[in-house]
């Protein structure tokens, strides 16, 4: 089962109202959550190059797209298309408009914008930003105060 389906299932089962996604890329998880739940999402991404990130060169070969209410994929012809940050940000922002105030976009790196997220405010946090173990470990620890009691960090 895809991770976005699992998160949506948890959201429904636990009656989650508010979530945070750190690293949205083009918004696959966010837009699935919009379609399948009533959750309000805070979405954080820098949409910038990360030459200091060893996972940055990760080879994506599929580009998610929503068409007629369904998730589809288009093949990338090269990895540079996956990392066209301006187009990915534009794609995300354009698709986010239809969801109004259910999506709050915060541009920046997750640890740099942490003070913009209120403590004890999130039912769940989905960590999908850097993908390196040391960074994700630090990010999880830093964001724990943002979770409501009983909230999930994944």
Where are the language model's segments positioned?
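S-adenosylmethionine/decaboxylated-SAM
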Residues: 2-154
């Amino acid at each position: 089962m895809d991770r976005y389906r699992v998160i949506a299932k948890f959201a429904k089962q636990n009656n989650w109202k508010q979530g945070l996604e750190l690293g949205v890329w083009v918004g696959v998880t966010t837009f699935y959550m919009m379609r399948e739940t009533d959750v309000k999402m805070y979405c954080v991404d820098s949409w910038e190059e990360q030459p200091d990130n060893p996972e940055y060169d990760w080879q994506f070969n599929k580009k998610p797209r929503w068409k007629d209410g369904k998730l589809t994929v288009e093949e990338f012809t090269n990895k540079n298309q996956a990392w066209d940050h301006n187009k990915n940000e534009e794609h995300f922002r354009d698709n986010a408009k239809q969801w109004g105030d259910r999506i709050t976009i915060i541009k920046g790196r997750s640890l740099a914008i942490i003070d913009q997220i209120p403590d004890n405010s999130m039912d769940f946090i989905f960590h999908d930003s850097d993908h390196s173990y040391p960074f994700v470990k630090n990010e999880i620890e830093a964001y724990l105060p943002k979770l409501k009691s009983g909230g999930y960090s994944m």
